[in-house]
């Protein structure tokens, strides 16, 4: 029988910009690449952080790269790689941000901030997920990268956010299976449709698509005359989602075919099913260190650099 697992708190994580406040910064850069002028590392870094704070992503990248160029062996240079990646991410330059993260990982694999680099890569893939009617290659990449974060750093805030996003990615993949399954069912390829709906139940059972997948199995099995299978899936739907609209439809469909459903649907306003309660939690809830700011897209910033 279908089991409903405990949902995780939905969190949207704030960014942490590791930077000193700016004192006497240079004026706004006019060109995408800075003209070489030797400057103190603290000034370059803090100016880059200031540009980032103002939303001038490309200028921020220029200053952080200048830190690396002028002071390649300093602690600031290491920090600047991740800040460059963060600025690229904020500017929607995901391929560049992934490249920055990979560079940091290759240079400093044992550094505590490597966890942020892995997280940044995962979030960049996550941001590139497309709708369910298109190829899901980016979705699969995001899922693999997010799982990597959880596996490597299970007790971190990065893993907490990654787990939430894994749930969202699974919902996306389930949606793709459902779209294909509906198409098969509509075009008379019932067995192929059943395979898609069963995949949702077996691989993505905690997603929002599970009730419909069970209903579609009832519908498909009735189409090919497998009444007992239809009744069994209807019972699973009823026991797990008695108040869901898909069970109301399944209940009616089974009755219309002379099959007595095992569970009565809940009345309107009755207690919601477990999955519905999980999915209704506020996904905009914020978890951040004291005094930190919220940032675009809920990215967790580079802690511990």
Curated annotation (Swiss-Prot):
InterPro entries: BamD, BamD-like, TPR-like_helical_dom_sf, TPR_rpt. Residues 1-24 form the signal peptide. Part of the Bam complex. Part of the outer membrane protein assembly complex, which is involved in assembly and insertion of beta-barrel proteins into the outer membrane. GO terms for biological process: Gram-negative-bacterium-type cell outer membrane assembly; protein insertion into membrane. SUPFAM superfamilies: TPR-like. A lipid is attached at residue 25 (S-diacylglycerol cysteine). This is Outer membrane protein assembly factor BamD. It is found in: Cell outer membrane. It is a lipid-anchor. Belongs to the BamD family. PROSITE patterns: PROKAR_LIPOPROTEIN, TPR, TPR_REGION. It comes from Caulobacter vibrioides (strain ATCC 19089 / CIP 103742 / CB 15). The gene is bamD. PANTHER family: OUTER MEMBRANE PROTEIN ASSEMBLY FACTOR BAMD, SOLUBLE LYTIC MUREIN TRANSGLYCOSYLASE-RELATED. The keyword Amino-acid biosynthesis does not apply. GO terms for cellular component: Bam protein complex. It comes from the Bacteria. Keywords: Cell outer membrane, Lipoprotein, Membrane, Palmitate, Repeat, Signal, TPR repeat. The keyword ATP-binding does not apply. TPR repeats lie at residues 41-74, 78-111, 113-136, 174-207. A lipid is attached at residue 25 (N-palmitoyl cysteine).
């Amino acid at each position: 029988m279908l089991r409903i697992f405990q949902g995780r708190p939905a969190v949207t994580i704030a960014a942490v910009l590791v930077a000193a406040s700016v004192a006497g910064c240079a004026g706004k850069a006019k060109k995408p690449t800075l003209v070489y002028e030797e400057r103190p590392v603290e000034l370059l870094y803090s100016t880059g952080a200031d540009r980032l704070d103002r939303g001038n992503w490309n200028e921020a990248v220029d200053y952080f790269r200048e830190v690396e160029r002028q002071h390649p062996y300093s602690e600031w240079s290491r920090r600047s790689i991740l800040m460059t990646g963060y600025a690229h991410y904020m500017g929607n330059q995901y391929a560049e941000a992934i490249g920055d993260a990979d560079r940091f990982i290759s240079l400093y694999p044992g550094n505590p901030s490597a966890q942020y680099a892995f997280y940044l890569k995962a979030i960049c893939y996550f941001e590139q997920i497309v709708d369910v009617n298109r190829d899901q290659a980016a979705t699969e990449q995001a899922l693999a990268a997010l799982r990597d974060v959880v596996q490597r750093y299970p007790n971190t805030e990065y893993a907490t956010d990654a787990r939430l996003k894994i749930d969202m990615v699974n919902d996306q993949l389930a949606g793709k299976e459902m779209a294909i399954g509906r198409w098969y069912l509509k075009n008379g390829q019932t067995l192929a449709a059943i395979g898609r709906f069963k995949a949702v139940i077996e691989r993505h059972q905690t997603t929002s698509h599970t009730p419909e997948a069970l209903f579609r199995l009832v519908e498909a099995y009735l189409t090919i005359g497998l009444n007992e299978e239809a009744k069994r899936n209807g019972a699973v739907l009823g026991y797990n989602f008695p108040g869901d609209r898909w069970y109301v439809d399944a209940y009616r469909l089974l009755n219309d075919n002379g099959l007595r459903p095992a569970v009565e649907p809940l009345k309107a306003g009755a207690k919601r099913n477990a999955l519905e309660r999980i999915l209704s939690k506020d996904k905009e809830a914020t978890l951040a260190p004291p005094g930190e700011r919220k940032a675009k897209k809920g990215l967790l910033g580079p802690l511990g650099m």
